[in-house]
Amino acid sequence: TVSAKEGYLVKKSNGCKYECFKLGENEHCDTECKAPNQGGSYGYCDTFECWCEGLPESTPTWPLPNKSCGKK
């Protein structure tokens, strides 16, 4: 079996999570999760941020080191 990673999707440029407003099944999160640059298998909205499952180990998830989304 191949172990898959899961976590909050994060914007590599600033360390911010992908926001969402419709909790649970969420087309936006699912699309972002399955995007070629992310490589996930399923995404949904959890606590107003996109959670992604089935990610390759190479895909970064929140939190990113040295990038705190504008917070100190």
Swiss-Prot record:
InterPro entries hit by this protein: LCN-type_CS_alpha_beta_dom (IPR044062), Scorpion_toxin-like (IPR003614), Scorpion_toxin-like_sf (IPR036574), Scorpion_toxinL (IPR018218), Scorpion_toxinL/defensin (IPR002061)
Pfam family, one: Toxin_3
Keyword Nucleotide-binding: no
In-chain residues carrying the UniProt-annotated modification Cysteine amide: 69
Subcellular location: Secreted
Record-stated family: Belongs to the long (4 C-C) scorpion toxin superfamily. Sodium channel inhibitor family. Beta subfamily.
Official protein name in the record: Toxin Cll8
Organism: Centruroides limpidus (Mexican scorpion)
